């Protein structure tokens, strides 16, 4: 069981104190486009990405309290104003707090690959999840997935063309091992230093996929 750390940071949100769905313009104090990172880790990816895109508001969600705390500390240290951090289970949070058709981007970087065959049904990103998250993307919204696990990367790259309402932004490739302009997290760089390859998948919601 994870040790719960009390997080007292202006960047940290208690999901139970948000409306259903949340009024994100009120939370951020502006109506800028809204993006979501699922699994923020220690916050290095979201900090760099948000700093590069000050006109976008970012929600960084993680189930682990320690990661949320480290992310908040990083944001405070770097004074990055356009991120809010939430500790919650991803799908539950999305259903309860994110308005459908509101996200300009979703980032999922190196989620648990559940490598054992009998556990793979526990993977976050599968065909059903891709269809689910599409409902929360705005038309033209981007879906980014990255993993260091070969089987996971190939699996996502293989099923995504069959999910309706998306366009492959890497076509004719189904995945790439480099994605220009996409920040690498500490974990990605660690995996690459070990000789592993990162699989990047990038799709965009089409107008036909509008909710």
UniProtKB/Swiss-Prot annotation:
Gene3D superfamilies: Vaccinia Virus protein VP39. The active site is at residue 112. PROSITE patterns: SAM_MT_TRMB. GO terms for molecular function: tRNA (guanine(46)-N7)-methyltransferase activity. S-adenosyl-L-methionine binds at residues 37, 62, 89, 112. It catalyses: guanosine(46) in tRNA + S-adenosyl-L-methionine = N(7)-methylguanosine(46) in tRNA + S-adenosyl-L-homocysteine. InterPro entries: SAM-dependent_MTases_sf, tRNA_(Gua-N-7)_MeTrfase_Trmb, tRNA_methyltr_TrmB_bact. Pathway: tRNA modification; N(7)-methylguanine-tRNA biosynthesis. The keyword Transferase applies. The keyword Translocase does not apply. It comes from the Bacteria. Keywords: Methyltransferase, S-adenosyl-L-methionine, Transferase, tRNA processing. One of its GO terms (cellular component) is tRNA methyltransferase complex. Its EC number is 2.1.1.33. SUPFAM superfamilies: S-adenosyl-L-methionine-dependent methyltransferases. Substrate binds at residues 116, 148. Belongs to the class I-like SAM-binding methyltransferase superfamily. TrmB family. Catalyzes the formation of N(7)-methylguanine at position 46 (m7G46) in tRNA. This is tRNA (guanine-N(7)-)-methyltransferase. The gene is trmB.
